[in-house]
Structures are given as structure tokens and as C-alpha cells.
Amino acid sequence: MLAKGLPPRSVLVKGCQTFLSAPREGLGRLRVPTGEGAGISTRSPRPFNEIPSPGDNGWLNLYHFWRETGTHKVHLHHVQNFQKYGPIYREKLGNVESVYVIDPEDVALLFKSEGPNPERFLIPPWVAYHQYYQRPIGVLLKKSAAWKKDRVALNQEVMAPEATKNFLPLLDAVSRDFVSVLHRRIKKAGSGNYSGDISDDLFRFAFESITNVIFGERQGMLEEVVNPEAQRFIDAIYQMFHTSVPMLNLPPDLFRLFRTKTWKDHVAAWDVIFSKADIYTQNFYWELRQKGSVHHDYRGILYRLLGDSKMSFEDIKANVTEMLAGGVDTTSMTLQWHLYEMARNLKVQDMLRAEVLAARHQAQGDMATMLQLVPLLKASIKETLRLHPISVTLQRYLVNDLVLRDYMIPAKTLVQVAIYALGREPTFFFDPENFDPTRWLSKDKNITYFRNLGFGWGVRQCLGRRIAELEMTIFLINMLENFRVEIQHLSDVGTTFNLILMPEKPISFTFWPFNQEATQQ
């Protein structure tokens, strides 16, 4: 039978079960129909209000959401709703109404209709802070032509291949220093290995990496004694993400008017982020003015932006602030999840290591060449982001009316792609709970079509994508060459939503060095 309110297109390919007749798998696993091979309706599209929904009372919906799931489990809330309503549903939480989709065919229709200046959901407390305190904004919060102008200029220095090749030595140096940190700890432990939670170390690694790429300078975050001011910046980023969650579905002005601790902590976090980013940028600018601009070596993204007249200094500062704020927790979390999956899947880890060692030998140590010889390693990053995406959804406001699943979705509607639910859906991924990077190497496009969404899609995909991909790949190359990574407990650590998806509890790794001589140095 059909799920309530679902059009004929929602029937699975002949011989398969319908959406709701499928058994739940694991923690709320579900089976949804694919667009391919499904029946296509020839009738007029159904109206928007017929899309399956829990009801139009946003505040009542929000109450049930808080009581039954909670904001920190919103990713599981999506999974449960797709199980209940089918592959498309609409939900109003508070005063925000969205249409949610999961099928890659629908995702393709959505992104292919996004227009030249796509708009996504803007985090309400971020907007409130920037507006109330009159902070400059970059591409993260800009719209339309203003966004386009900044994005085009930034793409040339952040996304273009001729620019990103300059990042390799900067990122490799930081990764090698991280390896040295672990070797020092193994030596200090005196047990031939090191065990512990390295999440704070990964935050510092990510901060050291992004600042080296932006400023062309090291901040000393991997030294024995850590710069306390830089650590304040890292802590502020975490606090900014964490305090955003309670204000996603309630007006941030309420938190501000009642002077809640959540709002005060959120403001304090942003104040630190802006203050530190401004100091970094201003110091770099004045040093450049004093020493001149004659340099043969690459000096980082900021140097290139300042040498170009396409952006004002205020716009440059705003965008540098956003890149710094967005380049720490996001990358470090993905690396932590990747180490976690490698430690739980030692055969996969051995395959990745064999590929890296062969690439090192063939490339004779040249990192640029090595990066072309590790397709499985790159696929493993995609696989990590499938199981553990940073964002719980991707969002677009429709530019024009769009028909999805035979429903007419009006222009300006917020449509969200539930990428956590998509990544763990057995209809779209065979054996979805299994960490299998080889699935991304398939030549069958139907297996990967609009499924690799960890960095978003299109012209508004993650600005730092190329930096993050290089940073993570180079980090993993160095780690695989130097250590075998194991985990003390193989059970699932769980996932929690703190604006980004994070491990629910600390992960303790054990690192076994291959080169004992390096450990003794």
C-alpha cells in the first residue's frame, strides 16, 4: 500500500516493497523509493498543502520535537520522519517551515534549479549577532550580487587549481609536525604506543593548518607550550557552534531581550572570534606595508587578496574571519571520524596504507604527485562524510516554482536535503552501515549520482572545500605512513548535533608507530 499522501511516483520499482511496508533497520533505518524506474504521474501536480506533514502548528511541532527527540538528535528526527511520511515531507518548527527530501533524484532537481545566486538557510543567531552589533559579513551570510562579487574573487585564491597547489607545502609541514607530536608522546609514555583522546590536538592541528594557508605563518599550536590566545580562539569557535543550537527554532531576539546565558555566551564567542581574527589580519597587513610586497614564495591567501583590488579591506577581513571560524571544528571533526572508522576497520586501514606507501615510492616523495595516486584514500574521505557529515542538511530557497514528487513547491520555499539520513539509507547505499570506500570508485554513475554531498553542491558549495580536502588527505597520508591506529572499544560512540555533527562521547585511540627510531628522537 502507499504511504499516506504519497503520489504514484513513490511506489518502488516492481518487486520491491513500498516505503512504509519496509522493516526498520537498526536505529530508525528505513527504505525509500528511488526516482529511477518509479512510475511518473501524468496528472497535474498536487498542491503544497498535501505534502505529508505532522501539522501546521509550528509551536506544537516544536514542543513535540523537544520532548520526543531533542535538538541534539535532529539527525535522527529526520530519519524517523522519512520512515513515517515517505521520501518527502514538510515540517514547521517554530516559525521556520521546510520541505525535506532524501532521494538523490530529487536532490538533483533541486540543485539544478538553484540559479546563479543560490540562497541557503542563514543561522538565525549568527544573523542576529552580526546585525545587532553591526559586524561586517562575508560570503557566509551575504546574498545575491554582493555574495557573487565576493565569491568570485575568493574562488580564484581558494578554489582554483593553480591557487590550491600552493597550499601543499604549507599543509604538509603542519601534518608532519602533528606526527612529531605523537612520536614525542609515545616516547614519553615509554610503552611503545600512545593512547588517548586527541580531539583537542585535532582542533589545534586544524587551526594551525588554516592559519598557515591564510597567513602563510605558523601559530605554534603544535609546540610543547600552546599560545593561550590562539587557544581562546579555538574555544570560542566551539562555544559559538554550541550556543547556536538553542536559537535555531526560537527568535534569537528573545534570548537577547531576556539576557539569557545562551545569548551572552554566544555574543562572547563571536566577540573573541572577531577580535582575534582582526588582530591576525591587521598585524599581517601592517607587516606587509612596512616590509613591502616583494616575495618570491607563496605567502598565503590573505597576501594574495590584499594584492588584488577586487575586494575592499573590510570585505577581506570579514571573509578571513569566516574562513577561520569555519576551518577548525569542521575539518577536525571529519578527521576524528575518519580515524575512528579506520580503527574499527583495520583491513580498510591496511588497504589505505598500502596505497599510500606505493604512491610514496612511485612519486619519489613528491606530494603533488602522490595526491594523484591515492584514489582509495580520497574515496575514504567521501565515505567518512557519508556516514558522518558535518552538516545535518543542505538547504536552498527555491528561485522558481518546482515540482518534486508530483507536489508543486512554490518559489521562496526552503527545501532541505537530509544528508545524514541519505547517507545511511539502504535504498541508496548498499550495506550503508559498512565503512566501504571502494563504493565511490565504481564506474556506475547510478551508485554515486548526487550522493557525494559532504561539501555541498554547485556554486555555493563549501568555500573551503579544496583546502579541507588537501588538508585531510595530506594528514592521513602522514598518519598512515607512521602509525597503526586502533581503538579500545569497537561499539558505536553515537552522534550528537551541536550545529555540526560530533561524537557523542570522547574517542580514545591507540597509536602504534612503525618507525621506533622516530619515536626515540
UniProtKB/Swiss-Prot annotation:
Keyword Oxidoreductase among record annotations: yes
FT transit peptide: 1-39
Pathway named in the protein's UniProt entry: Lipid metabolism; C21-steroid hormone metabolism; Steroid metabolism; cholesterol metabolism
Gene field: CYP11A1
The UniProt record lists the keyword Transferase: no
Keyword vocabulary terms for this entry: Cholesterol metabolism, Disease variant, Heme, Iron, Lipid biosynthesis, Lipid metabolism, Membrane, Metal-binding, Mitochondrion, Mitochondrion inner membrane, Monooxygenase, Oxidoreductase, Steroid biosynthesis, Steroid metabolism, Steroidogenesis, Sterol metabolism, Transit peptide
One Pfam family from the record: p450
Names of the cofactor(s): heme
CDD domains attached to this UniProt entry: CYP11A1
Organism: Homo sapiens (Human)
Family matches, as Gene3D superfamilies: Cytochrome P450
Coiled coil: none
Top EC group: oxidoreductase
GO cellular component entries: mitochondrial inner membrane; mitochondrial matrix; mitochondrion
Topology term for the membrane: Peripheral membrane protein
Similarity field: Belongs to the cytochrome P450 family.
Record protein name field: Cholesterol side-chain cleavage enzyme, mitochondrial
InterPro entries: CYP11_CYP27_families, Cyt_P450, Cyt_P450_CS, Cyt_P450_E_grp-I, Cyt_P450_sf
GO biological process per UniProt: C21-steroid hormone biosynthetic process; cellular response to peptide hormone stimulus; cholesterol metabolic process; cortisol metabolic process; glucocorticoid biosynthetic process; sterol metabolic process; vitamin D metabolic process
Disease with which this protein is associated in UniProt: Adrenal insufficiency, congenital, with 46,XY sex reversal: A rare disorder that can present as acute adrenal insufficiency in infancy or childhood. ACTH and plasma renin activity are elevated and adrenal steroids are inappropriately low or absent; the 46,XY patients have female external genitalia, sometimes with clitoromegaly. The phenotypic spectrum ranges from prematurity, complete underandrogenization, and severe early-onset adrenal failure to term birth with clitoromegaly and later-onset adrenal failure.
Complex formation: Interacts with FDX1/adrenodoxin.
